[in-house]
Amino acid sequence: MAGRQPQQALPKAAAKQIAKEVVKQEKKEPVVRKKKQFYPNPKFNNRFNKKFVKKQLDKNLKKQGFEGPKPRFAVTVSATIGKVGPNKSQGPELQISTFMHPSLMKEPNDGTNFGPLQSAAAQWGLWRLKNLSVTFTPLVGPSAVTGSVFRISLNMAQSPGATSWGGLGARKHKDVAVGKQFTWKLQKGDLTGPRETWWLTDTNEEGAQSCGPLLEIHGLGETTSTYKDAAWAGDLFIVEVRGRWEFANYNSKPALGMLERVTETTNASIEVANGNMIMTVPQNSQLARHMSERFERTTNASTVGETIWQIVDEGAGLVANVAPPPFTWLIKGGWWFVKKLLGRSANTDVQYLVYASLADAQNNRPVEAQNYTKVTRQTTLSSTQINAPNTGPNTTTGSIGNNNQQWPIPPTGVPVGDFYVCGRMTTLHMGGQSGIQATTLVNGMIYRTDHPEPSTSPVSNWEFTVLENNTIVGAGMGCVWFQKSEALVWTLDGQKLSGWNTLDGVGTTQLTVAWRQHNRTIYGWANVVAWNSEEWHTNAEQPHQPILRLTYWLVKINVLSEPEDFDVVQKSPLAYLEDYTTAQSKSAIQKLNFQTFQKPEGGGTLRAQYSTTPRQGDFAVIWQIGRHNFDMSTGKGTPVESLSDYVMPQQKDAHIGMWYRALTSVGPRSDVLTLHFHLPTVEKDLVEQIIDQIQHRYRLTPLDSDSDSSSSDSDFEPEDRFEKLKIYEGLRSSGLSHHVSDGAAIAVKKKLRRGHAE
């Protein structure tokens, strides 16, 4: 108790010493500490893993070469592939069938239009689609039509097959309801090619390796109008595609960018002769000129061409009426391939061998079927050039004259000023008896004194009335009609041919035509395009006699109207000689009056029989002959009212081409006519006219007026630059110098940017 005991301090010192030794030992042997475990958000972790795995998979696929070469060029393009029309029957009907190949992705009747997609196809050896969207834009509301549904499907086989609605459903497909906008999106995996996801660009190679997948659109059920008890006649959808095409392996083949596509309504036939199925089209049709021998190697032998054409029966005229066994399924499928039979006479219709698949066409294995009698039907055919035997640059192999112009020359542009139209024109109706087919009475002029209700627009006593708003400015006593594809159009400068044109894109005036049928009047049936008028004698020759004038109008039909036969008063011009003696024969006066046609069994009427009906987009010529006024500058005048005698002096020299047809009562139902028309003057200066023609030639459209008009050429979008390049190249190819072509291209682009603001 007398102080701290020494024996108690010893253990404490020993403890400190032991602690020091332990620290030294720990420094020599470091302790492995347990790492802190990280627990991330599960959602973030899953997303991270998916991206990581996809990235690694893509990396490994590219590393191992499963996706082929790396894309060297890519372009995104929008294109209209056609319109979907009404179904004419209950069964599945093919509306559109088109390859996704970049050279074949063209609008109907686009010809050899050279776009960015075709430009790339002409320069690269491999192609593929990264993505594709197909948009259906309705042209009619859902309440206007009923009875039909449409199905778009992807065909990877490059050949037609037996089509059923259930079979189409077994493909990758989507159904589209009428009247609603719809977009179908396809991804890279749906469109991949056979060569490490790539397709060959050269369509002369095996079809399964080059042409790519097809888009097919079918309709089921007859399309009818909900407003009236009748079939629907208008289009239902416009179909557009937008996709991104990728290219690799540069390999220039210029001809692949110039493959053509043409759509035409014409008479086509199918037959089986000597065991081979043959398709025939008229020699003067646009399709025959399109699928001509200019694409073939020169030969005089009777052989088969090398160019392959895809034929799509969009009008279903052959599909519904032709069934050659055992290949009924091929025609019913709505599309096939053909090659031209060479060495045939130039004065006969053009024949093509039919093939069931692209591979058969490439290997020249035509369809072999039982003998089948030739069947001809009117239908709408779409022809697409699949390949070009010569893929190099085009060279002129034959020319006529010293201008190195290769024939045949395709028509381009619309006529300017006075022009001529030559073609087979058909009488609208014939005169006959009920139940008896009319054969020769071609100029029955329907004359009716009864008029529609006062609430409607006024009409004349004749079958057709030319109107400006609600004012009568002319009448049509007779009518012939023709298809624009069967007409030749040209302009003359004295004795020289100054233009070889087409009626595609020709403008119309504000004058309209009303058509009086049996129990209704079709207002706005057509619009006036051009006209002409000529007198047979003047007041100076016979002041006391009524003036005989012939006036006719070229009109473009707007409405498809199916008339019905009916009995009506019909008159016809009848030329005759007055009573005269032999001594007075040299001074005899010819006269013209209008005589009423009568039935043989009596009565003052005759049946108007309509054997053919013009369609929307066709053209017609209506005329009136007799006493009336007319202004050539405006195309307006007065209708013929007087039916009294007209004196016709001798030695008349006519210049219009219509007198013989207007003065005859008996003749063939159709004949070839050549008519002279006057095109109304457009108040534009020379520069405006040239720019308008360039716009029509290259299918350019003005930009919105609110776009930046002050931007320079360097601010143009790539599409604008390409359009400017198209204009420049076209002007250079026509023989203009660089400075003139470049200046004109810039002027056109500035006008396009101004739009309609002016």
From Swiss-Prot:
Summarizing the annotation, the consequence of altering N519T is: In strain: VS34
Site note Cleavage applies to: T298, T299, N347, T348
Q: Which Pfam families match?
A: Astro_capsid_N
Instruction: Give the span(s) annotated as Inner core.
Output: 63-255
Q: Which InterPro entries match?
A: Astro_capsid_N (IPR004337), Viral_coat (IPR029053)
Where is the segment annotated Basic?
1-62
Question: Gene Ontology cellular component?
Answer: T=3 icosahedral viral capsid
User: Its GO biological process terms?
Assistant: clathrin-dependent endocytosis of virus by host cell
What are the boundaries of the region Disordered? 21-43
- Composition bias, kind Basic and acidic residues: at what positions? 21-32
Q: Note whether Heme occurs among the keywords.
A: no
Cytoplasm as a keyword of this entry, yes or no, is no
Report keywords, A-Z.
Answer: Capsid protein, Clathrin-mediated endocytosis of virus by host, T=3 icosahedral capsid protein, Viral penetration into host cytoplasm, Virion, Virus endocytosis by host, Virus entry into host cell
Could you say which protein family the record assigns here? Belongs to the astroviridae capsid polyprotein family.
Q: What else is known?
A: The Human astrovirus VA1 is a neurotropic virus.
- Please identify the protein, giving its name as recorded: Capsid polyprotein VP86
